[in-house]
Amino acid sequence: MKLLSVLALSATATSVLGASIPVDTRAEKFLIELAPGETRWVTEEEKWELKRKGQDFFDITDEEVGFTAAVAQPAIAYPTSIRHADAVNAMIATLSKENMQRDLTKLSSFHNRYYKADFGKQSATWLQEQVQAAINSAGASRYGAKVVSFRHNWAQHSIVATIPGRSPEIVVVGAHQDSINQRSPMTGRAPGADDNGSGSVTILEALRGVLQDQTIVQGKAANTIEFHWYAGEEAGLLGSQAIFANYKQTGKKVKGMLNQDMTGYIKGMVDKGLKVSFGIITDNVNANLTKFVRMVISKYCSIPTIDTRCGYACSDHASANRNGYPSAMVAESPIDLLDPHLHTDSDTIDYLDFDHMIEHAKLIVGFVTELAK
């Protein structure tokens, strides 16, 4: 994720719809999209320099020829009232800060989780093992629940856990699993406790909570549920782009996607004398799904919301949106008060508040159950 900033980009951006773009073959280059239709070929170091300046982007180098970003999304009717309070509250009661502390301590102990590094592969393998253990513990595999690796052409794989429902229409919760030290991406220490170890373990704990409901475990929910952990977000939303492009190509229907990127830092709000709140992202999201998310928060969470904007391609919900799937994003705080330690070796567990992370987990359980059950 990013700290929002406005940049004056000096290099000429080229329209996707324009003439062919020459590639400098003297060094590996990547095609990035900085805004709708504005692209540029850059080296990997130039990508990191943009990120250091607060500029996010899609890396569309491997995008299918002829791909067109969605300009409209199907009209989906979302619930306008809470229908499953008893079930959700029972699941929420099982959520554990201790589980999240244990998981995040381990996840942030990898030297880094860079998507091209062996550490990124190792951390993804460990994380998938925890997801599999949650499914096994709930007995959900007997009813078709599973977790699979979504492979890419780099070391770290994405992870997709599926709990089948009566309909193939999918309710998705996602978080990116990779981390980065922007000064030294491949070898630098990048614990990534908040960005985005916090989101990764938050949705893992929410998965455990959801798997306490036997209607869901036994495949009797109305819709299918998926939990995603994306590889390569920091390099241009690579893993989530690959997954949602695949879903688009294969005709999968997604009812809604909720993204969780950074869920644990509250000091910025506290230092400003503000009430600790969720940051509701209002740009590059689906307005109707976001309205539904607000309703879920008001029912199941104990903190209020603040509207905030995070810019183009700021996190993985943008990949769903780009492929025509409705998405929403809830951050730990307003964007201008996010954790200042992100992308450094100082992004450690010491700065995080697990009560705040539990609030995010409560949101996820409510979102999934009210939309899928």
From Swiss-Prot:
GO terms for molecular function: aminopeptidase activity; metal ion binding; metalloexopeptidase activity. Disulfide bonds join 310-314. Its main location: secreted. Zn(2+) 2 binds at residues 195, 234, 343. InterPro entries: M28_fam (IPR045175), Peptidase_M28 (IPR007484). Residues 1-18 form the signal peptide. Keywords: Aminopeptidase, Disulfide bond, Glycoprotein, Hydrolase, Metal-binding, Protease, Secreted, Signal, Virulence, Zinc. GO terms for cellular component: extracellular region. It is found in: Secreted. Glycans are attached at residues 196, 288. Monomer. Extracellular aminopeptidase which contributes to pathogenicity. Belongs to the peptidase M28 family. M28E subfamily. This is Probable leucine aminopeptidase 1. It comes from Arthroderma benhamiae (strain ATCC MYA-4681 / CBS 112371).
